[in-house]
Amino acid sequence: MAEITASLVKELRDRTGAGMMECKKALVEANGDIELAIDNMRKSGQAKAAKKAGRVAAEGVILARVENGFGVLVEMNCETDFVAKDAGFLGLANEVTDFAAANKGTTIEALQAQFEEKRAALVAKIGENMNIRRVAYLDGQVIAQYLHGAKIGVLVAGEGSADELKKVAMHVAASKPEFVNPEDVSAEVVEHERQIQIDIAINSGKPKEIAEKMVEGRMKKFTGEVSLTGQAFVMDPSVSVGDFLKSVNTSVSNFIRLEVGEGIEKKEEDFAAEVAKITGGNA
């Protein structure tokens, strides 16, 4: 039996919005497998949806450059928001991004090696660890970029108006699509969601045959919700992004979205445990 920790229960609660006891029970039944617990909670109606894994906890910046025919995003991390605004840290981050733009195709390993000496010197000066974490390139006839407070960076590639593509980049920053078009959603992702929706319908009392027919309509809605062109446009929710693009004679071929600290989880201090430790367990 896997250990069901308080942090695991908290993560499940954060991702599903369900109560603490429901989350603990679901984790026990799933033997600590949080993804299985989420699926089971959705099937039973305890959770309507779940946020994607990977809490954003690390600090740092996302920077972007657009050159002729391509764009690049660079993520540089540090430990605190204070250092993320430091002139020395930002200076190095900009230097790294300029180098990446001037040397298209540079790998993250090569980028880290190129600036290791300067990084180490800045760490010694500031007294806080930092690292060049990610670099991502995007090719395209027209490239638009959007930075949201240096915490989210988006590149959108396509054809047509750069100004209209920038609006789409702003949409990507806000709505986090996973695919460009509904038909791009992988068969594996679709089938996984389809099975969950069938179980939800069956658990609500519908016969299997009827449940399967009901789900077909839901799956079209699902693929639209996770794809860029199928989503409601944030600047005009009455139309989809796809319809907006058609109206301005513009198309999107691909996009990249990076957010500071994706997939990195800072160690959170357990306040109650710390108090118990200090007081000898008598708190």
From Swiss-Prot:
Name this protein carries in UniProt: Elongation factor Ts
Any Pfam family matching the protein: EF_TS
Record region (Involved in Mg(2+) ion dislocation from EF-Tu): 80-83
GO MF annotation terms: translation elongation factor activity
Subcellular location: Cytoplasm
InterPro entries for the chain: EF-Ts_dimer_sf, Transl_elong_EFTs/EF1B, Transl_elong_EFTs/EF1B_dimer, Transl_elong_Ts_CS, UBA-like_sf
Entry function: Associates with the EF-Tu.GDP complex and induces the exchange of GDP to GTP. It remains bound to the aminoacyl-tRNA.EF-Tu.GTP complex up to the GTP hydrolysis stage on the ribosome.
Family: Belongs to the EF-Ts family.
Gene Ontology biological process terms in this record: translational elongation
GO cellular component: cytoplasm
Keywords: Cytoplasm, Elongation factor, Protein biosynthesis
Cytoplasm listed as a keyword: yes
